[in-house]
From Swiss-Prot:
The keyword Flavoprotein does not apply. Its main location: cytoplasm. Component of the ribosome, a large ribonucleoprotein complex responsible for the synthesis of proteins in the cell. The small ribosomal subunit (SSU) binds messenger RNAs (mRNAs) and translates the encoded message by selecting cognate aminoacyl-transfer RNA (tRNA) molecules. The large subunit (LSU) contains the ribosomal catalytic site termed the peptidyl transferase center (PTC), which catalyzes the formation of peptide bonds, thereby polymerizing the amino acids delivered by tRNAs into a polypeptide chain. InterPro entries: P1/P2_N_sf, Ribosomal_P1/P2, Ribosomal_P1/P2_euk, Ribosomal_P2. The lineage of its organism: Eukaryota, Fungi, Dikarya, Ascomycota, Taphrinomycotina. This is Large ribosomal subunit protein P2B.
Length: 110
């Protein structure tokens, strides 16, 4: 991703087809040591392609991917388990209420 970001920075800055040394110099300004193989791979993949068209195609593909997870619903038939769970929750709430009343707010630094 960092290689692509450097490539995009260079193209936005006016370089029509950034070279490997251009990308490496951008990355070195922020303290990243570039891997020559990855830079060459990126350049070969993007060579001769219009960046705006690639971004538009990527946005179109991303729009088809669901971004929010579906809400998980429990399976039907768990009434007995639900009753036990609610009883356990009530017991926890009672314990929490008892604990908070014990020190009357003055036991913080005792």
């Amino acid at each position: 991703m960092k290689y692509l970001a450097a490539y995009l920075l260079l193209t936005v800055g006016g370089k029509q087809s950034p070279s490997a040394s251009d990308i490496e110099s951008v990355l070195s300004t922020v303290g990243i040591e570039a891997e020559a193989e990855r830079v060459e791979s990126l350049i070969s993949e993007l060579n001769g392609k219009n960046i705006e068209e690639l971004i538009a195609a990527g946005n179109e593909k991303l729009s088809t991917v669901p971004s929010a997870g579906a809400v998980a619903t429990p399976a039907a038939g768990g009434a007995a388990g639900a009753e036990a769970t609610s009883a356990a929750e009530e017991a926890k709430e009672e314990e929490a209420a008892e604990e908070s009343d014990e020190d009357m707010g003055f036991g913080l630094f005792d």
